[in-house]
A protein has these predicted regions:
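Short acidic, glycine/serine/threonine-rich loops at helix termini
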Residues: 3-5, 100-106, 172-175, 226, ...
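Active-site-proximal alpha-helical scaffold in enzymes
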Residues: 64-95, 138-173, 213-219
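Condensing-enzyme catalytic core mediating Claisen C-C bond formation in acyl metabolism
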Residues: 1-9, 18, 122-131, 151, ...
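Short coil/turn connectors at secondary-structure junctions
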Residues: 27-30, 56-59, 83-89, 155-159, ...
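Conserved active-site "lid/cap" helical segment
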Residues: 1-68, 144-157, 163, 178-184, ...
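Short glycine/threonine-rich loop-to-helix capping motif typified by GTGT followed
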Residues: 40-50, 247-251, 284-298
Length: 298
């Protein structure tokens, strides 16, 4: 939500201490701290966080990786534990985004010329933003959803809105959610249109928030209490991918290939198939994104 009375370190501290308390451990047990923060990536959030929750001399990794920043911090802790370098680590992701405005490209400047010349470090043409597409996140995922609908059929404005209806209903079950208000399908469809087919209620808001997790090795876990062992969640796979080069991505980013690749590798490492899943927690930055990624996870 919005926390004008708390800064980034306050939010990170609250999440970190909550995770440590929930796990029944302390900073003295941690062998690594991985801190993810994109908007203040040069601020050394991890070191600032240490000053609030405990400075024990352990290595700190500050990571910034766009929408995957928090997940990358978690993966950093997982890799450190998996390598055998440490037995236990703490991962934290935090952002202060309330009031940050539109994320993505800033739009086409008024001083920009219409002249089209090949340029750029990667051999790309001049920016397409504001000409034949957009790099702003609402625009990108609106295009992604429409492209998916044209390619496969079966989608509609109402179908995308039903995804948001379901998610708003789920929010009422989580006291820590940014918004905990159920919304009707009609309210969602009649809300302010941001980028068709996503209305405001179908877009994730820019919020302040933080999350944290304690990662522990299997051997270390066996030395902890039975209750700690019972509540521990096994990490069967953690995968990070990037986009392979495609010429068309200069106009519209391909959010599908890297997701499909990550899912495929994760299933292989975990030794399961999509049909084995009982629950999926899926990043729903926009309602259109959720539907597209259903398919990408199959």
């Amino acid at each position: 939500g919005k926390h004008p009375d708390k800064d980034t370190v306050d939010l990170a501290s609250e999440a970190a201490l909550g995770a440590l308390r929930d796990g029944g451990v302390s900073m003295r047990d941690m062998g690594i701290l991985a801190a993810g923060c994109l908007m203040q990536s040069n601020a050394g959030i991890g070191q600032q966080l240490q000053k609030q929750i405990g400075q024990t001399g352990i290595p700190v990794y500050n990571v910034a990786n766009a929408c995957a920043t928090g997940a990358t911090a978690l993966r950093t802790a997982i890799m450190a534990v998996k390598s055998g370098e440490v037995e236990m680590g703490l991962a934290v992701g935090v952002e202060k985004l309330a009031g940050a405005g539109l994320l993505g490209a800033g739009g086409r400047p008024k001083s920009d010329k219409n002249e089209w010349k090949p340029s750029g470090r990667y051999g790309a043409v001049t920016s397409t933003d504001g000409r034949i597409g957009t790099d702003s996140m609402p625009g990108v995922f609106a295009q992604v959803g429409m492209e998916y609908g044209h390619k496969y059929g079966g989608t509609s404005f109402e179908l995308f809105a039903k995804i948001a209806e379901k998610n708003h209903a789920h929010s009422t079950l989580n006291p820590l959610a940014a918004y905990t208000k159920r919304m009707t399908l009609e309210e969602i469809m009649n809300d302010v249109m941001i980028a068709y087919p996503n209305t405001r209620s179908m877009c994730s808001a820019n919020c302040d928030g933080a999350a944290a997790a304690v990662v522990v090795s299997g051997s270390k876990l066996r030395t902890l209490s039975l209750e700690q062992q019972r509540r521990a969640i096994k990490v069967k796979a953690s995968v990070l991918t990037t986009d392979p080069y495609e010429e068309g991505c200069q106009v519209l980013p391909n959010v599908n290939t890297l997701t499909k690749n990550a899912a495929r590798i994760a299933y292989e490492r975990a030794g399961i198939a999509p049909s084995d899943l009982d629950l999926v927690e899926l990043h729903d930055c926009f309602a259109t994104a959720e539907l597209v990624h259903y398919d990408n996870l199959m």
